[in-house]
Amino acid sequence: MLRLIIMALLVLPASVAWAAECAPEKMVRIVTRDATPGIDPQSFPALPKTLYRLGNGRGRVEEMPDASRGVHGLIVVNEPDAWIVNLHDRSGRHVVDPGPGLIFRAPILDGGGELPAPLRELEFGCELAFVQAYAPKSDERVDAGGGLMLDKHQLSRGDHRVAILVHPKDRGIYAVAHYKAGKIVRVVRYVEYQQGLAPDARLFSRPDGIQFAAPRPRASR
């Protein structure tokens, strides 16, 4: 369950200050994979992950099964409740957010409070809002291979730089790359991106058929 707990810390409300709030009015479904150079594309870290989010307090993260470790991760957040589940053995934890701010966060970049403030605002589901706010003008149009041309939007703060590749016609997100001191830290490749979906309350409800440990409140922020 360790990886699930770490993942939960990434998607649950963070203890660092956030200047902007990502709150899609309609449900968003995003499938991504880690395409960072050096990661084995056949390994578990490179397998697709699916995120659903709605409003500022509901989110769901689905991992692919990791049979070698006996883990099939699922995280469901419906503030103030969060359920961290291992579907492999049907076990889970129920965590209660004590507040005061009951906000679901899904940051794209690793680093938390170490990141410059604007970069902490870059979240799954609100990428184009970030581009519009901080890098509305494309730096260049790049060839992603096979003649696929993409608009490259960039923002730099200190040692950090983020590059967001966007399809020029439909403004769909193709990839996000994070650099520090000129070296690549992470590349997220978008496999699917669906917006404006009808809300499905079941996705953000307590998962059925899971043996949950007693609820544990998170430390107040």
For the regions a protein language model found, what residue spans apply to each?
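N-terminal leader/targeting segments and the immediate start of mature chains
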Residues: 2, 8-12, 16-59, 89-94, ...
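Solvent-exposed helix/loop surface patches that form functional interfaces
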Residues: 99-140, 145, 202-213
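Gly/Pro-enriched, hydrophobic low-complexity segments
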Residues: 66-70, 83, 139-210
